[in-house]
Amino acid sequence: MMVMVRIFPRDGLEESWKAVLDNLKALSDAYCTPLYLSQREEDDFMTLIYDVTDADCLADIVVKNIPSVLHPEKTRTITLLKPVFFPAPRDRPQNLERYQVAVRGSPGELEDIFNRILYLEYPSDVFPTYAAYSFGEDDILTSMLSTSRNRVEQFLRANLESQKGVVRIDIGHINRSKRVAPAEMWKRYRQSRSPLKLLFEEYDYLYPDILHGAEDALV
C-alpha cells in the first residue's frame, strides 16, 4: 500500500526538508519504507510517500517518530489505492517540469475516468508518471511531466475535462522532489506496479537527472 504523509512544518520548509533527508532511518521501519519526498509550489507542506505493509506501524511513525524528529504543526495522510506507474517515452524533451493533477469525479464514473487516464495516448511532452485513487479531498491523483503548465492544461482540457463524470481538475506545480528509496529498489517497485508496461515497448524506465523541478522524474 502506498501512503502520502503531508507534513506541515513549524520552522519552515527548508529546515524540515533537510531534517527528513537527515533522519530517514528514524522515519522508517521494516514495514514502512520512504520512497519519495516532494513539495508543491503553492502549498505550505511537503509530502513523504511510503510503501506500507503494516498500517499500524505507519500509525506509530506518524504519531511518534515524525513528531519527535520533525516537530510539525500537523500531518495529514492520503492512501493511494490501485497505483499504476508509467514508463517515460524515449523521445521526451529534456526540460520537463512535474505537476500534480487532482481529479474530483462522480462516484459512479470514477472507474471510467481512471481508465481514461490510464489508456490515453500521451504525447512526448505531456505524460503521467503515476495515477492512483485517493478518495479524500480528491478522488484521483496523478503526476505528470510536461514542458509547461499551459501544455498540461491544454492537454487535459482536450482529453479529460469532457469525460463523463469529471467534476473538477486541479493542477499544482511540483517545484522540488527527491527519490529517497534506493534506485534499484525504486525501479523494481515501479515495474511491479506497471500493468501497462507491455503497451509501451518504446518507453523506458530511465530518467535524466536534469529535469527542472522533477528530480529523477519520479512520482
Where are these regions (language model features)?
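A compositional/biophysical signature of low hydrophobicity enriched in polar/charged and small residues
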Residues: 1-219
